[in-house]
Protein backbone atom coordinates (compact mmCIF):
# COMPACT_ATOMS: atom_id res chain seq x y z
CA UNK A 1 0.00 0.00 0.00
CA UNK A 2 1.30 3.47 -0.88
CA UNK A 3 2.14 5.95 1.87
CA UNK A 4 -0.43 8.75 2.26
CA UNK A 5 1.28 12.11 1.72
CA UNK A 6 -1.88 14.15 2.34
CA UNK A 7 -4.04 13.92 5.46
CA UNK A 8 -7.72 13.11 5.09
CA UNK A 9 -9.09 9.80 3.83
CA UNK A 10 -11.67 7.07 4.44
CA UNK A 11 -10.88 3.55 5.62
CA UNK A 12 -13.85 1.15 5.45
CA UNK A 13 -14.03 -2.14 7.33
CA UNK A 14 -16.92 -4.33 6.19
CA UNK A 15 -18.20 -7.89 6.21
CA UNK A 16 -20.86 -10.07 7.80
CA UNK A 17 -21.66 -10.29 11.50
CA UNK A 18 -19.04 -11.98 13.71
CA UNK A 19 -16.28 -11.25 11.16
CA UNK A 20 -14.40 -8.94 13.54
CA UNK A 21 -15.34 -5.52 12.12
CA UNK A 22 -15.77 -3.76 15.48
CA UNK A 23 -12.67 -5.54 16.80
CA UNK A 24 -10.62 -4.15 13.91
CA UNK A 25 -12.07 -0.66 14.36
CA UNK A 26 -11.20 -0.76 18.07
CA UNK A 27 -7.66 -1.91 17.22
CA UNK A 28 -7.13 1.02 14.86
CA UNK A 29 -8.64 3.48 17.35
CA UNK A 30 -6.35 2.28 20.15
CA UNK A 31 -3.33 2.46 17.87
CA UNK A 32 -4.17 6.09 17.03
CA UNK A 33 -4.69 6.90 20.71
CA UNK A 34 -1.34 5.32 21.54
CA UNK A 35 0.18 7.70 18.97
CA UNK A 36 -1.30 10.60 21.00
CA UNK A 37 -3.88 11.42 18.34
CA UNK A 38 -7.28 12.77 19.34
CA UNK A 39 -9.96 10.31 18.31
CA UNK A 40 -13.73 10.76 18.28
CA UNK A 41 -15.73 7.53 18.09
CA UNK A 42 -19.39 7.49 17.05
CA UNK A 43 -22.15 4.92 16.83
CA UNK A 44 -25.85 5.09 15.87
CA UNK A 45 -28.25 5.32 18.82
CA UNK A 46 -30.12 2.29 17.46
CA UNK A 47 -27.14 0.06 18.31
CA UNK A 48 -27.54 -0.62 22.02
CA UNK A 49 -26.92 -4.38 22.08
CA UNK A 50 -24.08 -4.28 24.60
CA UNK A 51 -23.76 -0.63 25.57
CA UNK A 52 -25.35 2.73 24.84
CA UNK A 53 -22.08 4.68 24.99
CA UNK A 54 -19.39 2.29 23.78
CA UNK A 55 -18.41 0.26 20.75
CA UNK A 56 -18.22 -3.32 22.01
CA UNK A 57 -16.89 -6.23 19.97
CA UNK A 58 -18.23 -9.77 20.23
CA UNK A 59 -14.98 -10.61 22.03
CA UNK A 60 -15.83 -8.11 24.76
CA UNK A 61 -13.29 -5.42 23.88
CA UNK A 62 -14.66 -1.90 23.93
CA UNK A 63 -13.95 1.79 23.40
CA UNK A 64 -16.03 4.75 24.56
CA UNK A 65 -18.29 6.13 21.82
CA UNK A 66 -20.74 8.98 21.31
CA UNK A 67 -24.21 7.80 20.24
CA UNK A 68 -25.82 9.97 17.56
CA UNK A 69 -29.22 9.76 15.89
CA UNK A 70 -28.19 11.47 12.65
CA UNK A 71 -24.88 11.79 10.80
CA UNK A 72 -24.86 15.60 11.02
CA UNK A 73 -24.78 15.43 14.84
CA UNK A 74 -21.17 14.31 14.62
CA UNK A 75 -20.05 17.80 13.64
CA UNK A 76 -21.01 19.06 17.11
CA UNK A 77 -18.29 16.92 18.70
CA UNK A 78 -15.50 17.27 16.12
CA UNK A 79 -13.03 20.15 16.40
CA UNK A 80 -9.82 21.30 14.77
CA UNK A 81 -7.95 19.32 17.44
CA UNK A 82 -9.52 16.06 16.28
CA UNK A 83 -7.28 13.82 14.20
CA UNK A 84 -9.33 10.67 13.70
CA UNK A 85 -13.08 10.06 13.40
CA UNK A 86 -14.25 6.45 13.87
CA UNK A 87 -17.80 5.30 13.09
CA UNK A 88 -19.16 1.85 13.95
CA UNK A 89 -22.29 0.16 12.54
CA UNK A 90 -22.31 2.72 9.76
CA UNK A 91 -24.95 0.78 7.79
CA UNK A 92 -27.64 2.00 10.20
CA UNK A 93 -27.19 5.66 9.22
CA UNK A 94 -29.10 7.39 6.43
CA UNK A 95 -27.41 8.23 3.13
CA UNK A 96 -26.49 11.58 4.68
CA UNK A 97 -23.52 9.75 6.18
CA UNK A 98 -21.93 9.70 2.71
CA UNK A 99 -21.74 13.50 2.54
CA UNK A 100 -20.61 13.72 6.17
CA UNK A 101 -17.76 11.27 5.60
CA UNK A 102 -16.75 12.98 2.35
CA UNK A 103 -16.69 16.36 4.11
CA UNK A 104 -14.58 15.06 6.98
CA UNK A 105 -12.05 13.40 4.68
CA UNK A 106 -11.87 16.48 2.46
CA UNK A 107 -11.18 18.60 5.56
CA UNK A 108 -8.17 16.46 6.48
CA UNK A 109 -9.60 13.99 8.98
CA UNK A 110 -8.77 10.31 8.93
CA UNK A 111 -12.13 8.52 8.94
CA UNK A 112 -12.39 4.87 10.01
CA UNK A 113 -15.80 3.31 9.39
CA UNK A 114 -17.08 -0.21 10.04
CA UNK A 115 -20.34 -1.85 9.04
CA UNK A 116 -22.23 -4.64 7.35
CA UNK A 117 -21.93 -4.69 3.57
CA UNK A 118 -24.98 -6.97 3.17
CA UNK A 119 -28.27 -7.17 5.03
CA UNK A 120 -29.81 -10.45 6.21
CA UNK A 121 -31.25 -10.96 2.72
CA UNK A 122 -27.77 -10.98 1.21
CA UNK A 123 -28.38 -7.63 -0.48
CA UNK A 124 -26.31 -4.39 -0.30
CA UNK A 125 -26.93 -2.64 3.02
CA UNK A 126 -27.80 1.06 3.13
CA UNK A 127 -24.96 3.50 2.38
CA UNK A 128 -22.15 0.93 2.62
CA UNK A 129 -21.86 0.18 -1.14
CA UNK A 130 -21.37 3.89 -1.87
CA UNK A 131 -18.83 4.18 0.95
CA UNK A 132 -16.92 1.21 -0.48
CA UNK A 133 -16.72 3.06 -3.80
CA UNK A 134 -15.33 6.31 -2.35
CA UNK A 135 -13.02 4.84 0.31
CA UNK A 136 -9.25 4.95 -0.13
CA UNK A 137 -9.00 1.62 1.68
CA UNK A 138 -11.53 -1.22 2.01
CA UNK A 139 -10.96 -4.17 4.33
CA UNK A 140 -13.52 -6.92 3.78
CA UNK A 141 -13.55 -9.47 6.58
CA UNK A 142 -15.11 -12.93 6.73
CA UNK A 143 -16.37 -15.05 9.59
CA UNK A 144 -16.75 -18.85 9.75
CA UNK A 145 -19.95 -20.52 8.53
CA UNK A 146 -21.74 -22.14 11.47
CA UNK A 147 -22.98 -24.94 9.20
CA UNK A 148 -19.90 -26.09 7.27
CA UNK A 149 -16.92 -24.12 8.56
CA UNK A 150 -16.21 -22.40 5.24
CA UNK A 151 -15.47 -18.66 5.07
CA UNK A 152 -18.73 -16.81 5.78
CA UNK A 153 -19.68 -13.65 3.91
CA UNK A 154 -23.36 -13.47 4.80
CA UNK A 155 -25.45 -12.91 7.91
CA UNK A 156 -28.20 -15.43 8.67
CA UNK A 157 -31.12 -14.02 10.62
CA UNK A 158 -32.96 -16.56 12.77
CA UNK A 159 -36.40 -16.08 14.32
CA UNK A 160 -37.15 -18.74 16.94
CA UNK A 161 -34.41 -20.83 15.37
CA UNK A 162 -35.77 -20.65 11.82
CA UNK A 163 -34.49 -18.54 8.89
CA UNK A 164 -36.21 -15.16 8.69
CA UNK A 165 -38.44 -14.43 5.71
CA UNK A 166 -37.37 -12.08 2.93
CA UNK A 167 -40.29 -9.79 3.83
CA UNK A 168 -39.08 -9.20 7.40
CA UNK A 169 -37.78 -5.70 8.29
CA UNK A 170 -34.18 -5.09 7.24
CA UNK A 171 -33.18 -3.38 10.49
CA UNK A 172 -33.53 -5.55 13.58
CA UNK A 173 -30.60 -5.14 15.96
CA UNK A 174 -29.67 -8.36 17.74
CA UNK A 175 -26.77 -10.48 18.91
CA UNK A 176 -25.83 -14.17 18.73
CA UNK A 177 -29.31 -15.44 19.54
CA UNK A 178 -30.71 -13.76 16.41
CA UNK A 179 -27.89 -14.00 13.87
CA UNK A 180 -25.27 -16.43 12.57
CA UNK A 181 -22.50 -16.12 9.99
CA UNK A 182 -23.10 -18.28 6.91
CA UNK A 183 -21.36 -19.01 3.64
CA UNK A 184 -23.07 -18.40 0.30
CA UNK A 185 -24.33 -21.98 0.08
CA UNK A 186 -25.88 -22.19 3.56
CA UNK A 187 -27.46 -18.74 3.63
CA UNK A 188 -31.25 -19.21 3.69
CA UNK A 189 -33.87 -16.53 2.96
CA UNK A 190 -37.37 -18.01 2.45
CA UNK A 191 -39.41 -15.98 -0.04
CA UNK A 192 -36.41 -14.36 -1.71
CA UNK A 193 -37.15 -13.64 -5.40
CA UNK A 194 -35.66 -16.21 -7.74
CA UNK A 195 -32.59 -15.33 -9.78
CA UNK A 196 -33.22 -13.99 -13.25
CA UNK A 197 -30.92 -16.50 -14.90
CA UNK A 198 -30.78 -20.27 -14.52
CA UNK A 199 -27.18 -21.04 -15.42
CA UNK A 200 -26.75 -24.20 -17.53
CA UNK A 201 -23.94 -25.27 -15.18
CA UNK A 202 -26.13 -24.99 -12.07
CA UNK A 203 -25.24 -28.57 -11.17
CA UNK A 204 -21.50 -27.90 -11.27
CA UNK A 205 -19.93 -28.69 -7.89
CA UNK A 206 -16.66 -26.84 -8.43
CA UNK A 207 -14.65 -29.98 -7.74
Swiss-Prot record:
Residues 184-198 have a biased composition (Basic residues). Residues 184-207 are annotated as: Disordered. Its EC number is 2.7.1.21. Its main location: cytoplasm. Gene3D superfamilies: 3.30.60.20, P-loop containing nucleotide triphosphate hydrolases. It catalyses: thymidine + ATP = dTMP + ADP + H(+). It comes from the Bacteria. Coiled coil: none annotated. SUPFAM superfamilies: Glucocorticoid receptor-like (DNA-binding domain), P-loop containing nucleoside triphosphate hydrolases. Keywords: ATP-binding, Cytoplasm, DNA synthesis, Kinase, Metal-binding, Nucleotide-binding, Transferase, Zinc. One of its GO terms (molecular function) is thymidine kinase activity. It is found in: Cytoplasm. GO terms for biological process: DNA biosynthetic process; thymidine metabolic process. Pfam families: TK (PF00265). One of its GO terms (cellular component) is cytosol. Zn(2+) binds at residues 145, 148, 183, 186. The active site is at 89 (proton acceptor). ATP binds at residues 15-22, 88-91. Belongs to the thymidine kinase family. Homotetramer. This is Thymidine kinase. It comes from Geobacillus kaustophilus (strain HTA426). The lineage of its organism: Bacteria, Bacillati, Bacillota, Bacilli, Bacillales.
Amino acid sequence: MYVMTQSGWLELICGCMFSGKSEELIRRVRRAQFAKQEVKVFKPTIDNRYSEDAVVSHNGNSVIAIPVATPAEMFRYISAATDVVAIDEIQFFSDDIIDVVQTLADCGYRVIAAGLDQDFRGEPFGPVPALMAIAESVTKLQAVCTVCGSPASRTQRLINGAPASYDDPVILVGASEAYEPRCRHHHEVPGKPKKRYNHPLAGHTGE
